């Protein structure tokens, strides 16, 4: 690597490191009071389309004895902050399963269900449907990836706390190399409608495995077995 590129890479990582903090959210009474005002307005949306190509029916593929989407839904239910959980999908099977788990469902139109449609387009379609139906104010929108079964309640809550504590516009999960992994994205409303990542953002290291293939599933199973 060219020396100038190495310098740029170091500067880039230094910048990101300044945005990654271990925080004691509940110790800050002022911020906790601010959260209390937001509590009923934090929603989580899981986009889960049916047309996966590399791993058929990926979002319902069983890992650790349960359909993959079960795990992020289960962890969201444990969250100290998330009020409502939604699954948006073009698949009746996925929507029926999500409904059986006790979460709210949104029918995703076919024209935004192909593999070229950006994830945020599905998220924002869901947000608009929620606003139209419930006439409720939304303060924070959380995008949770269905094919990231390693997501934990602790990671979700840490991202929410990080956003509120530092008054970020959004917080994203990143891997150990500080690259965005897409597993968790927490956004203040209406920053979710921006096409690009906000300049006022923070990140939380999660290093979550993103499942796309059988090889990924096997790696996940091995890692779980070794724990």
Residue spans of the language-model regions?
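Hydrophobic helical membrane-anchoring modules
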Residues: 7, 16-25, 36-38, 200-227
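Intrinsic-disorder-associated, low-complexity terminal segments enriched in Asp/Asn/His/Tyr and depleted
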Residues: 2-5, 11-14
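N-terminal glycine-rich phosphate-binding loop and ensuing alpha1 helix
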Residues: 41-88
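Short phosphate-binding loop-to-helix
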Residues: 24, 86, 92-142, 151, ...
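Short beta-strand scaffold positions
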Residues: 88-89, 211
């Amino acid at each position: 690597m060219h020396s100038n590129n190495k310098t740029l890479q170091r500067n880039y990582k230094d910048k990101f490191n300044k945005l990654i903090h271990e925080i004691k959210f509940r110790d800050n009474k002022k911020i906790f009071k601010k959260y209390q005002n937001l509590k009923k307005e934090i929603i989580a949306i899981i986009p889960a389309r049916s047309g996966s190509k590399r791993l058929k029916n990926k979002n319902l593929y069983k890992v650790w004895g349960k359909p993959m989407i079960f795990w992020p839904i289960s962890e969201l239910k444990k969250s100290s902050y998330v009020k409502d959980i939604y699954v948006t999908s073009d698949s009746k099977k996925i929507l029926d399963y999500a409904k059986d788990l006790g979460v709210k469902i949104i029918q995703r139109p076919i024209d935004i269900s192909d593999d070229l449609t950006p994830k945020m387009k599905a998220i924002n379609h869901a947000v608009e449907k929620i606003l139209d139906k419930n006439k409720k104010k939304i303060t924070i929108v959380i995008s949770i990836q269905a094919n990231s079964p390693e997501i934990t309640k602790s990671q979700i809550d840490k991202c929410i706390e990080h956003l509120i504590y530092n008054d970020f516009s959004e917080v994203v999960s990143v891997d150990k190399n500080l690259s965005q992994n897409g597993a968790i994205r927490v956004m203040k409303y209406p920053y979710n409608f921006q096409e690009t990542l906000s300049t006022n953002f923070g990140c939380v290291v999660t290093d979550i495995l993103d499942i796309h293939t059988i090889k990924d599933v096997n790696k996940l199973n091995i890692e779980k077995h070794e724990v």
